[in-house]
Curated annotation (Swiss-Prot):
This is Protein IQ-DOMAIN 25. Residues 81-91, 99-110 are annotated as: Calmodulin-binding. It holds the Pfam family IQ. It is found in: Nucleus; Cell membrane. It comes from Arabidopsis thaliana (Mouse-ear cress). Residues 198-219, 262-302, 346-377 are annotated as: Disordered. Residues 285-294 have a biased composition (Polar residues). Keywords: Calmodulin-binding, Cell membrane, Membrane, Nucleus, Repeat.
């Protein structure tokens, strides 16, 4: 009896395993190999195809690069085959575990049913000894199958965990490599941008250093003596102010000196006096208190002549052109030179106004009629000298 039961269970198990295996083979497209019906042509084709089925059968008449490529190709193919066989084995184990679990569940249900029938059946007390023995054998065998199915399920779970961990680790490593490459690329781009910025800032720094050096040279070449003379020439309303501030070399080397033409230059051209080769003409747009309409009567235009020993400004006041060029090297004209605010600022820093109509208060002025107009001379020029010196000192402190 026991032998028959053992054989029966073995046959059932083999049939179930065979069905599961055949089902998986059909699922993955694995067909049994048949050698019948093969001719010589197909055999030769198979032999030709199987010449390079693995990296061990690579022909020696190919180059090293091709051999290396074939080795890598076959290695990748072998890895793919191993993965496929591993997946098939895992699937087969899972199917076997599922079959075992189903069998265990059926056995447990049968045991429960038999126990219930034995307790409540009419023949519960009159069962034979062989029947009870068969029930015990079935219970033991079903318990064994259930334990085996449980072990198979645990193994499947462990295999799945290993495979998933391997895949997750590979994905994490690939992500880290891509992030490192991205960080390196960003670092390279930042370094290139910083180098470009430093290269663009270098010329500006050099020009600033050149500008400061020229200012230092200009400040070192200044003189403190200021001479104010009263013009006693034949032309009326003419004043000459001589301020030896710069040397000729400093004035000519000044890169910020510009020659600006007066707005009235087309109508009244400026005069150019060149007693020395290094003198140059310079006309500007800076007004002073002496060039206002209240002080200036009607007179021709004005000009400034720059000499090697200083700066000589000859001002001819005129009602139409309220301009005065005082080029001492301490300032240069820019794009804000011809605005109202800049003119007011220069007027506030210039010498105090001297009104010709106040005879009692301006005791230092003397009127004389000669030539073709009224000529005013001042015996004492201390006020004008102090104003010019203060203006130059303020310009120097500003620079």
């Amino acid at each position: 009896m026991r032998k028959n039961l053992t054989k029966l269970t073995r046959v059932k198990r083999e049939t179930k395993m065979g069905r599961a295996t055949r089902w998986f083979k059909g699922l993955f497209g694995i067909k049994p190999s048949s050698c019948s019906g093969t001719d010589s042509g197909t055999i030769s084709n198979r032999l030709d195809r199987s010449l390079c089925d693995s990296y061990e059968t690579i022909p020696p008449n190919i180059s090293e690069k091709e051999a290396a490529w074939l080795r890598s190709f076959y290695a990748a193919g072998e890895e793919e085959k191993e993965r496929r066989t591993h997946a098939i084995a895992v699937a087969a184990a899972t199917a076997a575990a599922a079959d075992a679990a189903v069998a265990a569940a059926k056995a447990a249900a049968a045991v429960v049913r038999l126990q219930g029938q034995g307790k409540s059946g009419p023949l519960g007390g009159g069962k034979s000894r062989e029947h009870r023995a068969a029930m015990q054998i079935q219970c033991a065998f079903r318990g064994y199958l259930a334990r085996k199915a449980l072990r198979a399920l645990r193994g499947v779970v462990k295999i799945q965990a290993l495979v998933r961990g391997f895949l997750v680790r590979n994905q994490a490593a690939a992500t880290l490599r891509s992030m490192e490459a991205l960080v390196r690329a960003q670092k390279t781009v930042k370094i290139q941008r910083a180098l470009r910025r430093n290269g663009n800032a270098a010329p500006a720094r050099k020009s600033t250093e050149r500008f400061s050096g020229s200012l230092e040279n200009r400040n070192n070449g200044e003189e403190t003596a200021k001479i104010v003379e009263v013009d006693t020439g034949t032309r009326p309303g003419t004043y000459r102010i001589r301020a030896p501030v710069l040397s000729g070399s400093d004035f000519l080397d000044n890169p910020f000196r510009r020659t600006l033409s007066s707005p009235l230059s087309g109508r009244v051209p400026p005069r150019l006096s060149m007693p020395k080769p290094e003198w140059e003409e310079c006309s500007s747009k800076f007004p002073t208190a002496q060039s206002t309409p209240r002080f200036s009567g009607g007179s021709p235009a004005r000009s400034v002549c720059c000499s090697g020993g200083g700066v000589e400004a000859e001002v001819d006041t005129e009602a139409d052109a309220n301009r005065f060029c005082f080029l001492s090297g301490e300032f240069n004209s820019g794009y804000m030179a011809d605005t109202t605010s800049f003119r007011a600022k220069l007027r506030s820093h210039s010498a105090p106004r001297q009104r010709p109509e106040s005879n009692a208060s301006a005791g230092g002025w003397r009127r004389s009629i000669g030539g073709g107009g009224v000529r005013m001379q001042r015996q004492s020029c201390s006020g004008v000298r102090e104003a010019v010196v203060g203006n130059i000192e303020r310009r120097r402190m500003r620079w």
